[in-house]
Amino acid sequence: GHYYRGREGKMHRWYTRDWMQYLAVKDNYHTGYPDVNATTYQTQVSAVHDALEAAVQRQLMSDVPYGVLLSGGLDSSVISAIAKKYAGKRIETDNKADAWWPQLHSFAVGLKGAPDLIKAREVAQYIGTIHHEINYTIQEGLDAIRDVIYFIETYDVTTVRASTPMYLLARVIKSMGIKMVLSGEGADEVFGGYLYFHKAPTPQAFHEETVRKLSKLYLYDCLRANKSLACLLYTSDAADE
């Protein structure tokens, strides 16, 4: 998080985590080391797996209808699968008894015939969500740009472009009464999923770039994900007032 200092006219980070420093993580095991201990490596993989499942499960402790955003990519597919796993169990029985209601709904948005929609449909069929595929036209996207800029409060071209489909998707989600959605946002920054990460010259350069990307999430990807969806899921249609 950040706080604003008026006299300086800029934002300040209010905390620094130890993992932000390369020296704090440089000795972590990974398969690239010739002397890697298989048991230790598997223990760390299991720890990440368990932490991710626990994080998703924690978000499902909600008293409002929820769903998942499913693009068909690895990140959103994993989150959707975990959400389906726990949404299918009753919390009050410590996830032992099956839950017959509510059923988990997944949502995908794109131009008609987009490859991502096909992949999202396949994943939804595999994990068993009630899937909703929302198509929009180029003209609908252009018509929405004014409202998108109003809600996300930025003129950054890339952010506006990526926010427009999410805004159109949010309108459909809201009309269905869904109040909360999970997505795979942030995974590429945490795990170095972008293609250019493969060209990192050193482990330190890789780590420093992931930290840099994480520190800027609130300006771009999270700005898009939070504001383009939250403006419709949690507020009135302010742009029409």
Listing of model-derived features with the role each one plays in the protein:
Residues 27-236:
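ATP-dependent adenylate-handling active sites, centered on carboxylate activation for C-N bond formation
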Residues 1-39:
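N-terminal segments that mediate ammonia production and transfer
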